[in-house]
Amino acid sequence: MATAQLQRTSMSALVFPNKISTEQQSLVLVKRLLAVSVSCITYLRGIFPECAYGTRYLDDLCVKILREDKNCPGSTQLVKWMLGCYDALQKKYLRMVVLAVYTNPEDPQTISECYQFKFKYASNGPVMDFISKNQSSESSMSSADTKKASILLIRKIYILMQNLGPLPNDVCLTMKLFYYDEVTPPDYQPPGFKDGDCEGVIFEGEPMYLNVGEVPTPFHTFKVKVTTEKERMENIDSAILSPKQLKTPLQKILMDKDDVADEQEHYISDDFDVETKMEEQKRNLGSSELGEPSLVCEEDEIMRSKESLDLSISHSQVEQLVSKTSELDVSESKTRSGKIFQNKMANGNQPVKSSKENRKRNQLESGKTVLYHFDSSSQESVPKRRKFSEPKEYV
């Protein structure tokens, strides 16, 4: 038992560094936070098969880490996308990564779910002006506090992903990168990406905006947000969401909006007992897979076990991800975590057409309405095109 615990502690240290006192250490942490977050999401949403993941531990939390696998071309492509993100991140150009799920391979601009990962950098040396509204900007955060915040964020992502209703059977992934235009060279593109030319996207159903949380260090801050179909939130435990509940906005939302618009979002609560919730769900579901909650893409796996922190990146082109989720029974859906969701039925044997399908049909009849704009800022009276990147090739 002691040996197993020691091994888990060692693996945890491999995922998140124990000490954050230099900008390089902070960069490693932020890169791995991005990798583990993407891994958690893609595993629990059933986007890739088990063979695409390795195993790591965060304290007592067993996580799945995305890796390149010859039997899963999709995971290999996502790993290459992540390497492109790392290139922009280390240059301090990267402002936001948007990982989007869509269902029609011919229409990647109509999305069903998306995940935003935002980055901030300390411009004049290490600062801590983003700790809390209730703390002084002169406050300091210890490495232990940073690691605790990192693990809490991953646990919150895990709980949210496990409780969301399942995605459709067949889904595709795309990724968009946004930059700090004032410092990013106009001709810069990360490996595997090209200049984006899409002005906006359509959300398939009624969107729900969730602010999952953030992790600050003296040199960076990392924030995670999720947008999902409102119907997938029907089985979410009310204790998971913050008491601050506001109406879901139906009007246009800026994908690269600044934090001034955060009051439009629901917040994943910091107050509920994450560990108790996870243990309770393990007992209720009795799933062997739930004992190994999944996360994806830890840096060591992405770099194919290279121990050096050298950030050399392959220049191979990135293709669009197309992958299938597990087959779902017509009367019930089961997520990767083992949780079962009953489908609504009519006449005992036919699925009821969802309001999402009705809304989508109405959109097609009346013309699509752009819900997300990628190229403008919420603080600009006249929207200005902002630089962003997308994968070079689509399948």
UniProtKB/Swiss-Prot annotation:
Compositional bias (Polar residues): 344-353
Record flagged with keyword Aminoacyl-tRNA synthetase: no
GO cellular component: chromosome; nucleus
Places the protein is found: Nucleus; Chromosome
Occurrences of domain HORMA (ranges): 24-226
Keyword check for Nucleus: yes
InterPro entries, per the entry: HORMA_dom, HORMA_dom_sf, HORMA_MeioticProgression
GO biological process assignments: blastocyst development; meiotic cell cycle; meiotic DNA double-strand break formation; meiotic recombination checkpoint signaling; meiotic sister chromatid cohesion; oogenesis; regulation of homologous chromosome segregation; spermatogenesis
Basic and acidic residues biased stretches: 354-363
Motif Nuclear localization signal in this chain: 384-387
Main location as per UniProt: nucleus
Post-translation changes: Phosphorylated at Ser-378 in a SPO11-dependent manner.
Keyword annotations: Chromosome, Differentiation, Meiosis, Nucleus, Oogenesis, Phosphoprotein, Spermatogenesis
Annotated region described as Disordered, given as residue ranges: 329-395
Modified residues (Phosphoserine): 377
Subunit structure: Interacts with HORMAD2. Interacts with IHO1.
Entry function: Plays a key role in meiotic progression. Regulates 3 different functions during meiosis: ensures that sufficient numbers of processed DNA double-strand breaks (DSBs) are available for successful homology search by increasing the steady-state numbers of single-stranded DSB ends. Promotes synaptonemal-complex formation independently of its role in homology search.
Protein name: HORMA domain-containing protein 1
The species this protein was found in: Canis lupus familiaris
